[in-house]
């Protein structure tokens, strides 16, 4: 009974939401069953208190530095720049972090917060598996129980990460309902949380869900743009012309964008999954085929049919095929501050191959969508322009898919 509002798309939203806590312009909010309201309020209060605690901040910074491997390099991709013949291209190397992706930034922060709250059990959802691996890693580090929910289609696509999670001590629950992907994994994780809220922290992996998650996850990832801004100023003596990042839920992108939002001359470009076609169900481009609605706790752009039912999605990348986008991205798009485009499966695969062959870097298929937009855009730019592409993760997990799709 209590689970229906979690997955339902609603097209209405309260008036004057701009003045309410937890909104980004008209987007965001807290649309959950009453059984979860107290848990979210507890989490919000704990996070606000933690932000004021100098020791909490110092412990996060220490673990990011000593355990995760921050700061990550900002690498000048000379070969790719020369090949494309336009803007100078830098790569923000989040793929070099412990566990292989940006996800560890958020997991360390939320893991410390869960411990501070006295929770001894962590649950998480995962699509590509990187958030599941990072959650299992942090749970092992802090001595916590960990259960990861993953759609059975993603389990099939990401066998390596499933084994990594189990090796780290996590229980992986394969979800066979619905489309058997990330949306369905989130549904099951939320059902678990409703049942076990006193002992369990839901370690949500993106800037999705009900307040305070979009704000909190963004805060844990803003280190990406904080570093990148200092690094590009040191390397070039000026701000970049553009920042490009892939957008599933949108955590790596908002992390890469955040410190540049106030710099109006810096273009912020998010790249969604264009999939294999423009018809509903053939892609996961929310701004191309979606409309505002409420899904799994937040009001944002959602892929939905004419009846308000959640539409199917497709992407070669398991981490980009979620039907909704983080509310802060919706607000940035509506304000005209960020631009959102789409790269197809074929374009992402070609970009992955190009980066591997020019720079010796195999990006995750998620990140390859951002590389694809760089490949399209950079040749049209001036040689004096500077582009930063956020390489959110490495492609080890995708080798099976790459071998199957590229066939060489």
UniProtKB/Swiss-Prot annotation:
Keyword Metal-binding: no
GO MF annotations, alphabetized: tryptophan synthase activity
Self-association and partners: Tetramer of two alpha and two beta chains.
Entry EC no(s): 4.2.1.20
Species name: Koribacter versatilis (strain Ellin345)
Pathway in which the depicted protein is active: Amino-acid biosynthesis; L-tryptophan biosynthesis; L-tryptophan from chorismate: step 5/5
CDD domains named in the record: Trp-synth_B (cd06446)
Cofactor: pyridoxal 5'-phosphate
Gene Ontology CC: one annotated term: cytoplasm
Gene3D superfamilies referenced in this protein's UniProt entry, alphabetically: 3.40.50.1100
Membership in a protein family: Belongs to the TrpB family.
Keyword annotations of the record: Amino-acid biosynthesis, Aromatic amino acid biosynthesis, Lyase, Pyridoxal phosphate, Tryptophan biosynthesis
PANTHER family for this protein: TRYPTOPHAN SYNTHASE, TRYPTOPHAN SYNTHASE-RELATED
NCBIfam families per UniProt: trpB
Catalytic activity: (1S,2R)-1-C-(indol-3-yl)glycerol 3-phosphate + L-serine = D-glyceraldehyde 3-phosphate + L-tryptophan + H2O
Top-rank taxon: Bacteria
Function: The beta subunit is responsible for the synthesis of L-tryptophan from indole and L-serine.
Name of the gene encoding the protein in the UniProt record: trpB
InterPro entries: Trp_synth_b_CS, Trp_synth_beta, Trp_synth_beta/beta-like, TrpB-like_PALP, TrpB-like_PALP_sf
N6-(pyridoxal phosphate)lysine modification, residue list: 103
Membrane-traversing stretches: none
Descriptive protein name: Tryptophan synthase beta chain
């Amino acid at each position: 009974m209590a689970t229906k509002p979690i997955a339902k798309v609603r097209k209405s939203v309260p008036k004057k939401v701009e003045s309410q806590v937890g909104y980004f312009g008209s987007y965001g909010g807290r649309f959950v069953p009453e059984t979860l309201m107290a848990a979210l309020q507890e989490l919000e209060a704990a996070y606000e208190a933690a932000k004021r605690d100098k020791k909490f901040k110092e412990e996060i910074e220490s673990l990011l530095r000593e355990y995760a491997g921050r700061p990550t390099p900002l690498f000048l991709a000379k070969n790719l720049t020369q090949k494309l013949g336009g803007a100078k291209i830098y790569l923000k190397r989040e793929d070099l972090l412990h566990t292989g992706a940006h996800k560890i930034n958020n997991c360390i922060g939320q893991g410390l917060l869960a411990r501070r709250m006295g929770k001894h059990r962590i649950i998480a959802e995962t699509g590509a598996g990187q958030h599941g691996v990072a959650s299992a890693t942090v749970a092992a580090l802090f001595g916590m129980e960990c259960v990861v929910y993953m759609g059975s289609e993603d389990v099939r696509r990401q066998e390596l990460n499933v084994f990594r999670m189990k090796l780290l001590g996590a229980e992986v629950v394969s979800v066979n309902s619905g489309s058997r992907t990330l949306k369905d994994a989130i549904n099951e994780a939320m059902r678990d949380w409703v049942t076990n809220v006193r002992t369990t922290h839901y370690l949500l992996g993106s800037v999705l869900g009900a307040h305070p998650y979009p704000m909190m996850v963004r805060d844990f990832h803003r280190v990406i743009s904080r570093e990148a801004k200092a690094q590009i100023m040191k390397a070039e003596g000026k701000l970049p012309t553009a920042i490009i990042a892939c957008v599933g839920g949108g955590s790596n992108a908002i992390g890469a964008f955040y410190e540049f939002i106030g710099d109006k001359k810096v273009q912020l470009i998010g790249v969604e999954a264009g999939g294999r076609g423009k018809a509903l169900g053939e892609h996961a481009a929310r701004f191309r085929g979606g409309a505002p609605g409420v899904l799994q706790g937040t009001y944002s752009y959602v892929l939905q049919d004419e009846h308000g039912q959640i539409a199917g999605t497709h992407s070669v990348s398991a981490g980009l095929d979620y039907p909704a986008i983080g509310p802060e991205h919706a607000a940035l798009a509506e304000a005209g501050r960020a631009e959102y485009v789409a790269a197809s499966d074929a374009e992402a695969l070609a970009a992955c191959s190009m980066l591997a062959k020019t720079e010796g870097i195999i990006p995750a298929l998620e990140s390859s969508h951002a590389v694809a937009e760089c490949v399209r855009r950079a040749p049209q730019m001036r040689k004096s322009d500077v582009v930063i592409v956020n390489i959110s993760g490495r492609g080890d997990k995708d080798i099976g898919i790459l071998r199957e799709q590229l066939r060489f």
